Amino acid sequence: MHLIRPFTGLRPATGRAAEVIAPPYDVLSTDEARTRAEGKPWSFLHISKPEIDLPAGTDPYAAQVYAKAAENLGLMMREGILTRDPARCYYVYRLIMGGHTQTGLVAAASLAEYEANRIRKHEHTQTDKENDRVRQIDALNAQTGPVMVAYPDAREVDDILDRCSAGAPDADATADGGVRHSLWVVRDAEIQARLTRAFDAMPALYIADGHHRSAAASRVAAARRAANPRHTGEENYNYFLVVIFPHHQMQILDYNRVVSGLNGMDVGTFLARVRENFTAEKSPKPVKPAKPAEFGLYLAGQWYRLAIRRELIPASDPVARLDVKLLSDHLLGPVLGINDLRRDKRIDYVGGIRGMTELERRVNSGEMTAAFALYPTRMEDLMAVAEAGNVMPTKSTWFEPKLADGLVSHVLD
């Protein structure tokens, strides 16, 4: 069994990509999705967020929602908006956001290798979110949300992808926000074989974004395997939809924190506690950390540059030395009493795409008391955590640009 293989992708008909592609299902609320899809009958949001086509207030996890997704997918196929390639292909997918470009391979990845941890994870998943994706995949009989994966340095693969994307793309669309999504179909059997061999030679791949989608695909495969007396391992359900990028091209933005209250302390007392483990210097302008172990703090209209004391940074533990963990272990927990980062209502998270002004706005509005700006987690840190078999703290990574839903889907029959 190969690590990856080509597949017969379901994708927008020629010239229809701009009408179809949509942000990932989990970055928009129902109301946001309804607004985005207004006047766009072929937006993939009608499949990924199908509750927008049902009465307001419909439970997004009701059976009728998944049925509506299947109905909408069937309609788009019957109307020729989505068409399926007749033969197995790989696809080269390029994302351009501002001055950033990354080029990856769309493929079907082996769930057996995922379950054997050759496709490595770095996050825990939540059962309710997994359940939602399982029901979506089963209802559609397809995986429509690609998992973002990284491969370690492989010049041969980089060169093949560059050559395959040298001509005009088969699909090209600029989405809301200005991100350009381009797709090239790789039909040549010899090039496909070279790509398959190159990935077979890799010791591991690393999931960057999409842990719930991959876990759900694994669960669907297990159920179908158990129900299929003629199971061979070659069925499409034994693979999951991925886009694999070279790790050095992937862009992780800062994932910042805002907190409500100072755990009963006034500003002076709080800063004194902070200075037990950090240096803290006032700054006349916003502090966007320029290196690891440096943090920005915005409090009472004032920015501070924080630096954790070097002796507190573990030399070898790949999780404990992460900036998100250092902040939690030496400030959020012991000073503010925020120990459950997933459930504590006093903390919220702000993706770096929103900028420093959003941190100031959340505090200046009185909604939050303090904001912490962090240096982005590096891909090398993520890979080290995955190699050690550990998991990242919650809200450690914010990848940009995001993959589009609807550009290529993986049908399970």
Regions found by a protein language model. Name each.
Residues 1-413:
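Surface-exposed, charge/polar-rich loops and edge strands
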